[in-house]
Amino acid sequence: MRHLIVLPLVLLTSSYKLFAQSFTFADTANFWLNELKAATKANQSLWNKDLYSPILLVNPVDRKVYANEPDSAGILKKQGPIFYGSLPTSVNISNTALEWSGKRWAMVMLPMPEEKANRLNLLTHELFHRAQPELGFVAYNPNNPHLDTRDGRIYLRMELEALKNAIAATDMKRRLQHVRHALIYRLERFQKFPGSDTTENQLELNEGICEFNGLLMSGRSDAEIREHLTARIDQFALSPSFVRSFAYETTPVYGWLLSSIDRGWNQRINASTDLTQFFIKAFGLQIDRPTIDQEAWQATPLYNGEEISRQETERETARQLLLNQYKKQFVESVHLQLPLINMNMSFDYTKMVVLEPYGTVYPVIRITDKWGTLEASKGVLISNKWDSATVSLPLQTAGNKISGDGWTLELNPGYTIEKDDVSNKFTVKPFLHP
């Protein structure tokens, strides 16, 4: 079974010196876990369930792990109030939910955010990932390549600008007008990119609802939530890729705004809910599809549409140059192709680049599979069918370790690299004894 693990990579700082003494950090971790336990208990009415459950706090530098429960295999040993051990190298480290050592866990990378609200937001986001199957949700992970195009990004940014105005509005009539405009820009996007309504909805039902849960369990006041969401939208506009990251921004805003007039709305949704239509109905809006083009155009000056269009046109020029570079690197030049069989991967979801019709380039990624472990910092092309990973030409080989420009591969026993002179590429294959 293939497992997709997504994460924004965390910049590790000298703060890890604080964690040098494991006993001291065990007390710190226990403090965070007690904070978390109190927050989930106080908010159990959100889903009629206390989400506190097995969780791993992992140091990606040395793979040390701190947990609130023992694992079934006895890898984690009790150390004061918590459990402590080392995570095997076969397990990719990220913010996610996973099955490991006999249990289903939430996993969160260290270091923790310094502010309590941000810390609880992150931890409860991942606890919701762990609880998704129990709550009737599915961890959909579709890409949304249209959100890497000029028009797709413009419509999404216009939607978010309208939502930002809705956050700031104190008058309910004005707030609903901005929400209406946001949903109109969304419907315009769906109309321009057929099928995007399905793929966007799937990611919002996964990451979007997780982030909504984190927001409401963060302990922020309404004023702090307004400030937090507004800052997030402004920061998101600078993100290099919207393909997988948009749902972290859209769904929490709609969800928080709706909670002010319909608390408990989230208990009426499931894995098959069309969130766009749900929001239109829940907000009491009437949107006439034949007139949305005109309404979207008329509302554009309210949301800085001209400047957004200018910025995205400029970005598109730079994107085309990057796509040409990636096409030469991964398609036209000699390269190494690895089959994806039973893959686990961790990557930075804010930097993905869609390279149609070949797949998606992940600039920073770690992949484990039957053949071994691949780590790359200058890009890996994952095919659209999720059946292969491509890196640039192999340059050095030392035993089972192979490397190229910006990547290293450690092969497991029984696998080797062969060159195919016909297709002008190298491939990883099982080693066949004569």
What are these regions (language model features)?
Residues 21-79, 210:
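N-terminal mature-domain "stem" immediately C-terminal to a signal peptide or N-terminal signal-anchor/transmembrane
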Residues 121-134:
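Active-site recognition of the HExxH zinc-binding catalytic motif
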Residues 1-24:
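Bacterial Sec-dependent N-terminal signal peptides
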Residues 108-123:
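Short pre-active-site segment immediately N-terminal to the catalytic Zn-binding motif
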Residues 270-434:
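Non-catalytic terminal regions of proteins
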Residues 134-190, 196, 200-226:
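Post-HExxH zinc-binding segment in Zn-dependent metallohydrolases
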Residues 83-102:
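Catalytic zinc-binding patch centered on the HExxH motif and its immediate surroundings
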Residues 194-224, 233-290:
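Active-site-proximal alpha-helical
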